Amino acid sequence: MEKPEWKPRSDKPRSDKPRSDKPRSDKPRSDKPQERKPFAKRPLLRRELERRVRKFAEPDIPVEITGEELEKRVRFQLTSLAIENAEAVAKHLVALDFFLETDPERAYWHGQSASHRAGRLAIVRERAGIAAVKHGKFDVALRELKAAHRMSANPSILPYIAECERALGNPRKALEIAGSIATNKLTDVEQVELRITSAACRIELGQMDAAVVTLTCKELNLADAPWGNRLRSAYSAALIAANRGNETLPWGK
């Protein structure tokens, strides 16, 4: 089979003549100084914020909340925001705390509003994440809390992250996180919550006796502690799961 003959794109021979015989001039095109056109002005931050807020339906803030109720250390962190935005974020954070136990869904939306306005602040993402945990929005909570931990490296966030992983069906991941935490950097409440989460993971993995061991601690005997009922309920549930429900409860001795 003969190879097809190659043909140039045009039958016209290429010219060896340069495009122009006129030598280039070293003289500038104009003696006038060249003026650069200014860049388009960036839209005002306030306008950007208003546009973003319009896309997000924020919950109403009770009229009695001023934002001044927020802890001073948190208010200080809001000083990097525009004044009006800082005031709005402060009010949302106060409302979040106010509704956290009585109306978790409303607290959740206040947290999302604050995060939408000030997502670059670790404390805002942390509070929003905790509210999401309380409302059972564990996927949202995990995103918020991981972002907060990346920004602040606050160990107090890790027990909540572990709880989210467990709730999302990742008990091994939750135990891995729990094992990486230096518990001496946690408050008593955070340590107890971490024990409860870890024990729940053990039960889900079929490690019933390990769950009982995890919950066996001196805090079981602290009747007036705020975590008392939750800890004792978790301990009793672990005993039942391990078929040891007839054992004497340690706080009854």
Regions from the PLM with identified roles:
Residues 1-76:
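Basic Arg/Gly/Lys-rich low-complexity intrinsically disordered segments
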Residues 80-116, 127, 133:
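Alpha-helical segment of the N-proximal tetratricopeptide repeat
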Residues 100-102, 135, 168, 205, ...:
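Structural motif corresponding to the intra-repeat A-B loop/turn of tetratricopeptide repeats
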Residues 78-84, 112-119, 146-153, 180-188, ...:
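Solenoid-like repeat scaffolds
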Residues 95, 127-128, 161, 198, ...:
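Structural register within alpha-helical repeat arrays
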